[in-house]
From Swiss-Prot:
<comment type="function">
    <text>IL6 is a potent inducer of the acute phase response. Rapid production of IL6 contributes to host defense during infection and tissue injury, but excessive IL6 synthesis is involved in disease pathology. In the innate immune response, is synthesized by myeloid cells, such as macrophages and dendritic cells, upon recognition of pathogens through toll-like receptors (TLRs) at the site of infection or tissue injury. In the adaptive immune response, is required for the differentiation of B cells into immunoglobulin-secreting cells.</text>
</comment>
<dbReference type="GO" id="GO:0042593">
    <property type="term" value="P:glucose homeostasis"/>
</dbReference>
<dbReference type="InterPro" id="IPR003574">
    <property type="entry name" value="IL-6-like"/>
</dbReference>
<dbReference type="GO" id="GO:0097421">
    <property type="term" value="P:liver regeneration"/>
</dbReference>
<dbReference type="GO" id="GO:0070102">
    <property type="term" value="P:interleukin-6-mediated signaling pathway"/>
</dbReference>
<dbReference type="GO" id="GO:0050796">
    <property type="term" value="P:regulation of insulin secretion"/>
</dbReference>
<feature type="region of interest" description="Disordered">
    <location>
        <begin position="156"/>
        <end position="175"/>
    </location>
</feature>
<dbReference type="GO" id="GO:0005615">
    <property type="term" value="C:extracellular space"/>
</dbReference>
<dbReference type="GO" id="GO:0072540">
    <property type="term" value="P:T-helper 17 cell lineage commitment"/>
</dbReference>
<feature type="disulfide bond">
    <location>
        <begin position="101"/>
        <end position="111"/>
    </location>
</feature>
<dbReference type="GO" id="GO:0070092">
    <property type="term" value="P:regulation of glucagon secretion"/>
</dbReference>
<dbReference type="GO" id="GO:0072574">
    <property type="term" value="P:hepatocyte proliferation"/>
</dbReference>
<dbReference type="GO" id="GO:0014823">
    <property type="term" value="P:response to activity"/>
</dbReference>
<dbReference type="GO" id="GO:0005138">
    <property type="term" value="F:interleukin-6 receptor binding"/>
</dbReference>
<dbReference type="GO" id="GO:0046427">
    <property type="term" value="P:positive regulation of receptor signaling pathway via JAK-STAT"/>
</dbReference>
<feature type="disulfide bond">
    <location>
        <begin position="72"/>
        <end position="78"/>
    </location>
</feature>
<dbReference type="GO" id="GO:0005896">
    <property type="term" value="C:interleukin-6 receptor complex"/>
</dbReference>
């Protein structure tokens, strides 16, 4: 079967497909062929096949790129905002040497754990985007749902799929309070910072996945 380009999916169709995938706990291709026909089967197989992790990450990166472009065009929040972003003290997940994802000191199990945990930590920031992002809401929804699907996929690759930590609800509540902005300018600055940070995290993750 020919592979399908993720750019061809609409956010709504893609999101529905991922929800079905997650609800059925990653069924086998044979099961999928029994459940649906034609393109619907192909769409679901794209995200249940173990070798499609890269495509899923690329899909998310494409949506992030589209959102950043929207922010740039609508609010002029472009690359010239780096100085402002550097001063922002949000505690966004980042890759470090100890995480085992860099070529020097690479450790597959440690790296998988860090990627999974980091993506879980990003969920609260994506909740914020769902609430505050005012442009194409479909892109935000697609990023959040596909990120959750990526978490499930990566957990299956690790030796301890349930070991990834879940942020404390109290911590999340405090973080949401911290994210609340007093003005439109700061809100948009936080949105672009979250998008940039998630993009960087996924770029590091993609490079690590390629050498696993």
């Amino acid at each position: 079967m020919n592979s399908l380009s993720t750019s061809a999916f609409s956010p709504v169709a893609f999101s529905l497909g991922l929800l079905l995938v997650m609800a059925t706990a990653f069924p086998t291709p044979e099961r999928l062929e029994e459940d649906a026909k034609g393109d619907a089967t192909s769409d679901k197989m794209l995200f249940t096949s173990p070798d499609k992790t890269e495509e899923l990450i690329k899909y998310i990166l494409g949506k992030i790129s589209a959102m950043r472009k929207e922010m740039c065009e609508k609010y002029e929040k472009c690359e010239n905002s780096k100085e402002v972003l550097a001063e922002n003290n949000l505690n966004l997940p980042k890759m470090a040497e100890k995480d085992g994802c860099f070529q020097s000191g690479f450790n597959q199990e440690t790296c998988l754990m860090r990627i999974t945990t980091g993506l879980v930590e990003f969920q609260i920031y994506l909740d914020y985007l769902q609430k505050e992002y005012e442009s194409n809401k479909g892109n935000v929804e697609a990023v959040q749902i596909s990120t959750k699907a990526l978490i499930q996929t990566l957990r299956q690759k690790g030796k301890n799929p349930d070991k990834a930590t879940t942020p404390n609800p109290t911590t999340n509540a405090g973080l949401l309070d911290k994210l609340q902005s007093q003005n439109e300018w700061m809100k948009n600055t936080k949105i672009i910072l979250i998008l940039r940070s998630l993009e960087d995290f996924l770029q590091f993750s993609l490079r690590a996945i390629r050498i696993m």
